[in-house]
Amino acid sequence: MPALRLLNTESQDKADYLHNQLTTDINVPSTYWECAESYLKGVGIYDVFLIEEQDFRNYKIFLHETGSFTKKQVFERTGFLRNLQKALIRNEYKELLDEIERCNTVQERLKGNVRNFLIRQGIHHVREIDYRTRELYESELRRTKTFSKSLEYLKTLDRIKQFDIRKEMETLSGRNKEQLKYEGQVIFLPYIPDQDIGSDFDYIQDKSELVWDFSQKASENLKRQIFQILCYALRNIKDSKDRRVRYLLPLRWMYEFCIEEGIDDIERLELEQIKKLETIVARKVVNVKNSMQIVDNSRKILFMSGKEIHWYANVWYMERFNFAPERVNPSNPVQRLSFYEVTNERNRELLQEYMKYQVGISDLALGNIRSQLCYIKKFLVYFNTIESICEITEEQIAEYFKLLQEQEIKAETVNRQIFDIHRFFAYLNVKGHIKGQIFDQNYYSQKVYPYHHDRSVQEDEYMEILKKLKFFPEVQRLIFLNLWATGLRISEVCTLKGDAYYWDGEDAWIKVYQIKMKAEKMIPISLVLYRIMKIYIKKHHIKSTDFLFNSKDGGAYRIGTFVKGFKASCKKYGIYISGETFKTHDYRHTLASSFYDDGVSIRTIRDYLGHNNENMTKQYIDYMPKRIEQANMEYFNQTENLLATGIIPKKRGEKTGK
């Protein structure tokens, strides 16, 4: 019974609301509104605002069919209802009508349909339009209009909304709302505050890809992460095509994948999950590698923007840290340290704890830390099935080291791996994760025998390069000249500064920081090289603290960039490179061997190259073949040592006497 009374009350309220609307103008004859009230109640309309064009026509037919009214009376009564609706709309929706009227980016003939729809939805201002409103309008248009007309009216709604956003952004209050805020809402990209970006999406035909639903049931942390990455892409990726192909589309696929898989943290994506996502992406695009960049890009955005360092993340990005200069090689920087390859979570946590110590507390160079991480990861992956690496036995470790020693790996590399693994266990021991040392590294280390590098570049090869060097790009030319003429390491050449070259009044010198040795040295150079580099420095207005050769991001020129570019130039100009590939270090060997052939002592060459000991220098010098050849020539140039000495030529047919 109470429910019935409630229903009756609601019905009466609606009837009263309609009655009040119809009797707004007291000067209108009661017969006008009484007739209209009776008809509207009969067809279930209790709000004058909701009367549509077809309703007006049906009312006109109804009046004719009663036979009680003349044509004039029918016209007057339908006119009353139309005029009443217009008056109510002008009074109730004045702001909305004015806002639509001000929009000068759409055709006037298309505004009416949009306006009527918004009024039926009870929308009083254009700013109230959101994606849900657009969705309702699209649904209505599909039912009532042709496909082409639907697109036309939807586009009109979008233009009205975008015009209003632009106008609002011109105000102080609007500019304060310029940044998107996470509110667990549905975001339609053409409606974002920054319309310079929003208008980029006008060309997208499938508007569904522009809808980002942060109201759906999913991990709140995941939704906030996706929102943050989305905002980053909108703000920082200026090329609209690149933004769509490398960020927005793959990000949407990753978002859908994470919801389906119940993933709540992108920074903790597992290797198997990444592979599964890659399989899904492969069904959507041809260039899978390009789209899968979203995983690394997303992790980096989140890691770099955290208020605190996310040590729990499966990938650490080194840009997040401020390292002492001597720990970084600007020409070959360590970009990231990854841990997701270790799928045993407990072992990964221990590895991350150890790497946190190495990165944050030790003074090791990042290149050494990366190398160490690589060796330990390989070790942990091998023992992935062990619940915790802390439970490993020496017998199991011995088995692993035996496998290492059976591979075609240099003894010093094997020893390096054993040493790094030993340091990892030493850390676990100090931190109380294990009790005592599990193995003795000296027991498993291999004996290292001195060996010689035969890596000198043949003269005809580098002379051909020098002959055609004028055709190479400027930076490639100058880097090669420094490699060939000075014997510097490629990392040292790529990190030369504007004050590297100087004249002491008698000789030209180059000052270089040895990244590998963490020391500065000076060596003499040719006057020609000095002059060439001084001209380059002056031409490009390079300051004393600036890098001579810059990468795209303004840092030191990348080693990989040079090698790749130089190889391409050699191929372009038909230059043959011996060996499997172009190796910059070979020119260091070449210069050292050249010095030795000219009679320079091993000690002097050692100092020039910047080695700590002569044994390393000896490995660089290809002295044996040339020394043997020279001794051979000297020996056989002596008449008594000629092989032909004592041989008496015989005439044809003459017996030998045997």
Residue ranges and their predicted role:
Residues 1-427, 431, 481:
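Charge-rich, intrinsically disordered N-terminal extensions
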Residues 32, 526-578:
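Active-site/catalytic core of tyrosine-dependent DNA strand-transfer enzymes
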Residues 460-490, 588:
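Basic, Lys/Arg- and aromatic-enriched nucleic-acid-binding interface segment
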Residues 496-531, 658:
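Conserved tyrosine-mediated DNA breakage-rejoining catalytic core shared by Y-recombinases
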Residues 501-505, 580, 600-621, 648:
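Short, polar N-cap/turn motifs at the start of nucleic acid-interacting alpha helices
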Residues 514-518, 609-637:
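Catalytic-site neighborhood detector that most strongly recognizes the C-terminal catalytic loop/helix
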Residues 553, 634-658:
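C-terminal secondary-structure termini that scaffold catalytic or DNA-interacting sites
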Residues 563-603:
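Short, basic (Lys/Arg/His-rich) helix/loop patches that form interaction surfaces
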